[in-house]
Amino acid sequence: MTRYQNLVNGKWKSSEQEITIYSPINQEELGTVPAMTQTEADEAMQAARAALPAWRALSAIERAAYLHKTAAILERDKEEIGTILAKEVAKGIKAAIGEVVRTADLIRYAAEEGLRITGQAMEGGGFEAASKNKLAVVRRESVGIVLAIAPFNYPVNLSASKIAPALIAGNVVMFKPPTQGSISGLLLAKAFEEAGIPAGVFNTITGRGSEIGDYIIEHKEVNFINFTGSTPIGERIGRLAGMRPIMLELGGKDAALVLEDADLEHAAKQIVAGAFSYSGQRCTAIKRVIVLESVADKLATLLQEEVSKLTVGDPFDNADITPVIDNASADFIWGLIEDAQEKEAQALTPIKREGNLLWPVLFDQVTKDMKVAWEEPFGPVLPIIRVASVEEAIAFANESEFGLQSSVFTNDFKKAFEIAEKLEVGTVHINNKTQRGPDNFPFLGVKGSGAGVQGIKYSIEAMTNVKSIVFDVK
């Protein structure tokens, strides 16, 4: 069994305590990762702080060269990393390899986008007469140490979406991968290390949340926190962060609104793809369908047909539905299913579970008193909610505590735009499934779904400070 190590100040280091990582597929032991202590976390933070001045002093072109090398290494090793990723988080092997390739593309784009983040010169004369002799040079400077905390569901891509923009902007990074997904995260770190990233610029921290979780968030050396995960943890990070800037990508209860004039066959295909990709373990998964009563029967039948085509089983067979991340997650999802059954939702698909493998469930006649109408399952469960009007559909969608994304299916462009304006979410997809990306697009949530705007350009800007240097020219 492989004993993985943390990258700290350019060296691979073990810890006295370790965490064994098991595959959600079959409980195979995949290896161990270090369980760092607070003292070891301090050492990593100190290394990052010491490395900051030299890294910040490099030109964007010099920093970009390291990112381009890293991207090339990821593409070279995509099969190896993708195989580990598939085992570690039970993701289909094709999708796992695709995640590594997408990550290489993201890192390249970040390297190039960093070259386009330039300053500006401003004259003061346009404001008041007394300021006509003033000239400002406005620059963007790195914030310092960025703490990047990634989720299990995209342990390579959503890690790099934080790391690459931070690095190209001149920041140094403390990377905390998810426990389940930490091996994949450390393989990403290995690519940066092989690319020659200077010692201390990129460091990793693995360990138990009870030991180092709050500690690294509150750490005095951290200047910016970039987190993807659950809303309760995100809210806690917000409280612990104090006055420091944060970027939070949190939960969602993304709704697909289906209007009477929609192409129902197209809508059904998009909804099922959006709901059940990676077994629904995506913050951007469609998690409820809100449909006009007049077309609900037909849509329900079409959705049932599409769900019946999904395959269930092993990620290495590229099954559509694979085991969820752990038994605790499966138990939570199962609780939502049982609650819906007890309250007389109509199951349109067989309900079956084997350990942490759940068959896809489609419920019709879901009402407001059912938990599945409101809670994020993070699993293969999709409720259909029938409404009498577009206004009711919008109100139901907006009643959620979350505000990540929505889809609207209609052939009326004007109506689609009007609805999009009224939905309290960060992104609205018209006649398409909810999804993250392309990675250069802005990605954000409102309400309980997050804080700050991601997307490569937006992430770079978020992880920099604006400095204005003002001259009196006469």
Residue ranges of model-derived segments:
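Rossmann-like NAD(P) dinucleotide-binding subdomain of oxidoreductase/dehydrogenase enzymes
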Residues: E75, G124-H266, V387
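Terminal low-complexity tails and localization/encapsulation signals of metabolic enzymes
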Residues: M1-T32, A65, K69, I117-L147, ...
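Conserved C-terminal structural/oligomerization subdomain of aldehyde/semialdehyde dehydrogenase
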Residues: E28-T32, V222, L257, T311, ...
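Short, well-ordered beta-strand elements within core beta-sheets of diverse protein domains
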Residues: L30-M36, A51-A57, L147-A148, A256-L259, ...
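Residue-level signal for inorganic ion chemistry
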Residues: Q27, R63, L85, I107, ...
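ALDH superfamily catalytic-core signature
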Residues: P232-T367, I430
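N-terminal Rossmann-like NAD(P)+-binding subdomain of aldehyde/semialdehyde dehydrogenases
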Residues: M1-K132, K309
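A short hydrophobic/small-residue beta-strand
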Residues: V172-M174, A347, T427
